[in-house]
Amino acid sequence: MMLGPEGGEGFVVKLRGLPWSCSVEDVQNFLSDCTIHDGAAGVHFIYTREGRQSGEAFVELGSEDDVKMALKKDRESMGHRYIEVFKSHRTEMDWVLKHSGPNSADSANDGFVRLRGLPFGCTKEEIVQFFSGLEIVPNGITLPVDPEGKITGEAFVQFASQELAEKALGKHKERIGHRYIEVFKSSQEEVRSYSDPPLKFMSVQRPGPYDRPGTARRYIGIVKQAGLERMRPSAYSTGYGGYEEYSGLSDGYGFTTDLFGRDLSYCLSGMYDHRYGDSEFTVQSTTGHCVHMRGLPYKATENDIYNFFSPLNPVRVHIEIGPDGRVTGEADVEFATHEEAVAAMSKDRANMQHRYIELFLNSTTGASNGAYSSQVMQGMGVSSAQATYSGLESQSVSGCYGAGYSGQNSMGGYD
C-alpha cells in the first residue's frame, strides 16, 4: 500500500505527450475527475536544458483511488494530442525534477524566465506591465542585442523568488501589443551564456525603475577626421538619438582638444588618466572615486561585479569593450565616496569565478565630480543655454569605445 504524500512515495502519475503550450489549468482539466494534491502546486512540468517544456509532467494526487482514475485517462486526448498516463512515485519525480531543466542540480533556482517574440521597440516598462503583480528584482530585466546592436526579440527577467517565476510561466502565449509572447524557464547560467562575445547585454532605452544607476549607456566608436575627433555610432551604439555626435576627446598624447582642436586640458579637472601596463585610456568619473579592474573573466557581467564588491554598492560599472567588439577583461567601477573606493581595494587579488582580479585605486579625498561648468562650455563656443551640461561618462582612446548616454544633437550628455 502506498503511503500518503506527507510520509512516503505519495500518489504520483506521470503524463507524456503534452502540448508544448500546455498549462497547469490544462492538466487540471484533463484530470478533472481526480483530486490533485495542493491544487496547481501539485502539477510539475519537466523542462529541457533550454527551459522549454519537454511534453511530460508529474502530478501529485490525493489518494490511491485518484491514481486509478488518472490511469483510466491513458490515451485520451488533450487538444489534438494523445496523452499517456503512467504510475510513478515521489522518488522518481524528485530525481527527474532535480536533474532536468536549466535549474537542475548544478544551477540555482534563481527565478529567471526567458521571453521570446517581443515586439520591436519593446521597453522594460512594458515587460513589467506584462508581469503585473509579480515582483521583479531591481535591474532584473535584460534585453540582449545582436552584434549590430539590434534587439533580438528576447529578454531575460529575474523574479524575487522561484515561485514567482513559476507563476510567470502562466503568461506563456499572452500578448504584448499584437505579438504573442513565449515564456520559458531560464537560469543565471543561460543569461551568462548570452554575454559571450560577440553578444553583449546593453540597455537600449532610457533607464527605468528596474535599472541600476548608470546602466543606460551607449558604446560609441571614435574616428579622427580633419583635425577633430568625430564620434559615430558603432555596432553597439543602440541608444536613441541616431545622429552623429561630436565631442572633444583626448588625442592619446595627454592633450585634450575640443571640436576645433583647441586644448581643453585646463578645464577637465574631473578627468584622470589610466595607465595599467599596456592599457591607456581616459575616463571621466561622475564621482571622482574609481577603482579599475583587470583580469575579469570574459563572461563577467555587471551583476558579477556588483556582487564582487558586496556589501559595498558601486554607483556605476563600465565594462570595457575593444575595437573588435570583444570585452577586454577590464572595467571601471565608481563609488560614491573616497572611503568606499579605498574599502573596495580590500578585494585586490580576490577571485571572480576562476580568475583573480587586480584592482587599481584612482580616487582622492575631495575629488571633483568632473562636471563641466557653464563658463568652460561657453569657452568652447557653445551658447549659454547649451552650456547646461554635465555627465560625459567615459571616453576611451586605446579601446576605441566611450560610454555616453545622450539625446539628439547633444555633445555626450543629456539634452
Swiss-Prot record:
The modification Phosphoserine is found at S104, S107, S161, S187, S193, S195, S265. SMART domains: RRM. One of its GO terms (biological process) is mRNA processing. Pfam families: RRM_1, zf-RNPHF. The modification N-acetylmethionine is found at M1, M2. Its main location: nucleus. There is a cross-link at K72 (Glycyl lysine isopeptide (Lys-Gly) (interchain with G-Cter in SUMO)). The modification Phosphothreonine is found at T215. Residues 13-85, 111-188, 289-366 form the RRM domain. The keyword Ligase does not apply. CDD domains: RRM1_hnRNPH_hnRNPH2_hnRNPF, RRM2_hnRNPH_hnRNPH2_hnRNPF, RRM3_hnRNPH_CRSF1_like. InterPro entries: ESRP, Nucleotide-bd_a/b_plait_sf, RBD_domain_sf, RRM_dom, Znf_CHHC. The N-terminal RRM domains are responsible for recognizing the G-tract of BCL-X RNA. This is Heterogeneous nuclear ribonucleoprotein F. It comes from Macaca fascicularis (Crab-eating macaque).
